[in-house]
Curated annotation (Swiss-Prot):
Names of the cofactor(s): Mg(2+)
Pfam family, one: CTP_transf_like
Keyword Thylakoid: no
Positions marked as site (Transition state stabilizer): 17
Reaction catalyzed: (R)-4'-phosphopantetheine + ATP + H(+) = 3'-dephospho-CoA + diphosphate
Quaternary state and interactors: Homohexamer.
Gene name of this polypeptide: coaD
SUPFAM superfamilies, per database record: Nucleotidylyl transferase
Species of provenance: Treponema denticola (strain ATCC 35405 / DSM 14222 / CIP 103919 / JCM 8153 / KCTC 15104)
Enzyme Commission identifier(s): 2.7.7.3
Name used for this protein in its record: Phosphopantetheine adenylyltransferase
Gene Ontology BP annotations: coenzyme A biosynthetic process
Length: 160
């Protein structure tokens, strides 16, 4: 039984995130999607809002679990008995950043392995920050985020 953890801010969740989750859940016995909650960061959506969206989006997979976490991801992995961290990489700059994190995580816990997953190429340009900016200008988000996320983005932007 191999448990894996896929952590991120998911602010908001995108089709790229879901593509990685869908593929990971076919490889690993369990995939734990962990919503990062860092009080020093400014998120558009609260941790609970992001968790709720991700739960809705992943409910079709019985082996995918969603939680929030506000500490080191290796500690979460150890807590649930996972030994794999999944990291999505779209390009060389993503890989460079994620490689450094993988080395650091390995230093924190020798049992942790990092698996890099490349999303389908049609999702390479998706960045949550760009999607939020596009939404703020009323841009078309179809093909970037699921309808429930698009609706939540529009509602959140109207509040601001």
């Amino acid at each position: 039984m191999v448990k894996a953890v896929f952590a991120g801010s998911f602010d908001p969740p995108t089709f790229g995130h879901l593509n990685v989750i869908e593929r990971a859940q076919k490889i690993f016995t369990e995939v734990h999607v962990v919503i990062a909650v860092n009080n020093n960061k400014n998120y558009l959506f609260s941790g609970e809002e992001r968790k709720h969206m991700m739960e809705e989006l992943t409910q079709k997979w019985d082996n995918v679990f969603v939680n929030t976490w506000n500490s080191l991801i290796v500690n979460y992995a150890e807590k649930i008995g996972a030994n794999v961290l999944i990291r999505g990489v779209r390009n060389v700059s993503d890989f460079s950043y994620e490689f450094d994190l993988a080395v650091m995580n390995k230093g924190l816990n020798q049992k942790i392995e990092t698996v890099f997953m490349v999303p389908d190429t049609k999702y390479f340009v998706l960045r949550s920050s760009s999607i939020k900016e596009l939404a703020s200008f009323g841009g078309n988000l179809s093909g970037m985020v699921p309808p429930i996320v698009e609706k939540a983005l529009k509602e959140k932007i109207e509040e601001i």
